[in-house]
Amino acid sequence: MKEKIRLTINGHGVEAEAGSTVLQVARQNDIYIPTLCYNEVLKPIESCRLCVVQVEGEPHFQASCGTEVQEGMVVTTDSEEIQQTRKLMLELLLKEHYGDCIAPCQLTCPAGIDIQGYIALISQGKYIEALKLIRERLPMPLTIGRVCPHFCEYKCNRNLVEEPININHLKRFVADYEMHSGKRNPPPLAEFSGRKVAIIGGGPAGLSAAHYLRRLGHGSTIFDAMPALGGMLRYGIPEYRLPKKILDWEIDGILELGNIEVKLGVKWGEDFTIESLRQEGYDAFLLAIGAWDTRKLGIVGEDLQGVWSGVDFLVDLTLEKPIEMGKNIAIIGGGNVAIDAARNSVRMGADTVTIIYRRSRDEMPASPEEIHGAEEEGVQFHFLAAPVRLFGSNGMVEKLEYVKMELGEPDASGRRRPVPMEGSETLIPVDMVIAAIGQFP
């Protein structure tokens, strides 16, 4: 049994267990002390300073959440000076941290979805209401729920207690619920304004713009160079990750909002210009052209036959164009494009598929589940390795030379910069190389 001690709070004698904090004892005796950052299951961090009290003999106010009671301690929890201090602390919090009360999961979400809100609705069985709340910020949850990197889950506060809430799958669940019900739930639409926007690009950005413009009452025409809408969602993500029937169902839902026209197989700069669209009467223009160009490796031999960009490889697969596959394939890069290219290569019959990445496994930007899936399918990984040269014969790539790396100081991204190790050059046989080191518009 813990030792009992006596102290005085606001002129009243109270008894408490040794090791308790002033805040805990006050609550046990129905004495109110305001708090903001305090959580009884977590260690006090004394961050908000709203719970300050006066302890006799101490020159400054003390945070009651982190101050242990002592025998004979005399505490004042409510005085004019204490109230003024708490008011000042609250004003400082509101002034400097206007988003302090927004959950870290929502702050991390690129779309800014009200995550707490839709999870609360799901917990009440209000699935369609949850879906409508998601669509306030994300018009394609059915699709994104299958490919989202769910940064939110890495910042979920439940990580401090056990493990994160499965935020992304809850989003996908309510979108699947609507699809399987067979009934769409369109958002409220403003009266048609008569204005029309030309949207150049039919990928996720262009489709999202058409959705929100229609909700505001404006019409749009989507112009796209490809034979079908979807952009990288359709042409850059393999079927096993994002089935085309899922994407089509969601796109159809956007087009069914009305006053959205589609023109496919037309290229900006060849078939039309901004000026020609202006002459056709469009009131505004949106460029949503995506990131289809890929970064070059910048090494000798990258112009040899058999060297592909990750985007070109995945697009040609989707379009079912003939591809002369190699047997020993090297993939350069560590993102999801690299993983997608590697897993597709395995499925197309390659003998060996090796991903070469210049940083460590922990620093790979690809989703952990995708990395694990690639390993399960037999993809090999060479971490801390960077290609320096490609060798060929008769114009065809035959060998790849890489150097081993070691991690140095962090760069601008916060990741440790890889530094080449002298004398670590290594040659491996290849007959196909796929570069997936980044994309740009």
Segments (PLM) and residue ranges:
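Residue-level detector of alpha-helix initiation sites
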Residues: P139, G203-P204, A228, G335-V337
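Cofactor-binding loop segments of dinucleotide-utilizing enzymes, especially the Rossmann-like FAD-
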Residues: N10, G202, A225, G334, ...
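FAD-binding core/adjacent interface of flavoenzyme oxidoreductases
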Residues: L94, C105, Y118, P141-I144, ...
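N-terminal Rossmann-like FAD-binding beta1-loop-alpha1 element of flavoenzymes
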Residues: K196-T221, A338-V346
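Glycine-rich FAD pyrophosphate-binding loop
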Residues: H218-R234, T354-R361
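Predominantly flavin-linked oxidoreductase catalytic cores and closely associated redox partners
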Residues: M325-I332, N336-V353
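A Rossmann-like FAD-binding core segment of flavoenzymes
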Residues: K245-K296, W308-T318, P322-M325, R347-P441
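Signature of N-terminal electron-transfer/Fe-S-associated modules in redox systems
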Residues: M1-L107, Q116, A120, Q124-I128
